[in-house]
Amino acid sequence: MARKVAAALGGELRGKTVAVLGLTFKPNTDDMREAPSIPLITALQDMGAKVRAYDPTGMEQAKSVLANVAFCKDAYDCAQGASAMVIVTEWEQFRALDFARLKKVMERPVLVDLRNIYRPEEIARHGFVYESVGRARK
């Protein structure tokens, strides 16, 4: 999945900031066991990215298993200066993001949706580059 993020940014992550939304293994829990965010964040860091992260309930647990991550107070704080935002866990609040606000705070309007919670045409209307999983490109 880190390669998908890199591809959305032209193949290079070194020196770029990636915002990760959702750290727990599923929504409505603080459980980090086998959370997909752990290998994703490790791979992003191995590729040279700086990682900012936010999760509604899993922040304290994530701090004990993730190193060198800037933990943020909300999705918009997380997006500040990011070259891309990645949705890893499908929390309900991530289904109602204010894309105009995100576009203002992000370095580049790139969304990698690993849970397919948005329709590509909806995100394109907001001027974002949108990558999802298992969907044909249009």
Label the model's feature ranges.
Residues 1-138:
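Structural/interface elements that position substrates and couple domains in central-metabolism enzymes
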